[in-house]
Amino acid sequence: GFLGTANIVAESGGTLGAVTYPMPDLAQRLETFFAMATERGLDADFHADETGDPSVATLRTIAKTVLKTGFDAPVTVGHCCSLAVQDESEADRTLDLVAEAGLNIVSLPLCNLYLQARDPGTTPRWRGVTLVHEMRKRGINVSFASDNTRDPFYAYGDLDMVEVLRESTRIAHLDHTKPHWFDAFCANPAKACGLSKSDLSVGSKADFIIFKARSMTEFLARPQSDRIVVREGKAIDRTLPDYAELDHLMTQTKEAQRMSA
């Protein structure tokens, strides 16, 4: 059961995660979840409200339960798509609770743009992106990520955060805003993961990427495939592996699917 799962997560030093769905006893289930996390000293992560159904609002229940229980370890919630199709007053109520509870939110524009409103033979009517601008105005720690990569949910992508930044700028209208959104791709995710913010000050780790661009428009206009990646002060080989070198990963996936069937 879930108790055994929580113990395994604790033994491996992981983060306790769950998917939330609307149900009558969700608040009670979440209280039990947070009690297990507290007893084991674990952070929490949720996959929530990845739907275009405005009646789905489990993010609000998560925030309320954090406030009720006083759970003080980091809590991260991904997707939260349904916020974008809810009545403005309802969404505002949820966002105020999220800010008060100090939740971290992760938006996944590429995958959610691809999956939401996907009905055969019809054109999608919305983008599937959560309310990132409204969150930032409230001081909520908002991050962006790629989510699925070349799997049954999203057959594309290459785990490239530059692609995520470039496409998220277009999808979520991150341009023409101040301050810039770079922190949502660097510092904010680090904060959500409990990592220290990196910088280029003397004594800091010399891990960074160099791009050929004189402005944001130049940076975003190209995929930056000629970037220079520096680790510990030295440029590393950035040659991408041939897809054939990755075939064993697909074989492992198929074998795992066969065994679980």
Region locations from a protein language model:
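Active-site microenvironment of metallo-dependent hydrolases
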Residues: 166, 179-261
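Active-site proximal loops enriched in glycine and acidic residues that flank catalytic Cys/His/Asp
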Residues: 48-50, 79-81, 107-110, 144-148, ...
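Positions that flank functional sites
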Residues: 24, 52, 112-113, 150-151
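Histidine/acidic residue-rich metal-binding segments in metalloenzymes
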Residues: 1-104, 121-144, 198
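Short Asp/Glu-rich motifs
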Residues: 28, 55-56, 117-118, 154-155, ...
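His/Asp/Glu-enriched, well-ordered alpha-helical/loop segment
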Residues: 43, 64-75, 115, 126-213
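Glycine/Thr-rich phosphate-binding loops of Rossmann-like dinucleotide-binding domains
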Residues: 26, 85, 114-115, 219
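Active-site clefts of carbohydrate-active enzymes
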Residues: 104, 111-113, 117-118
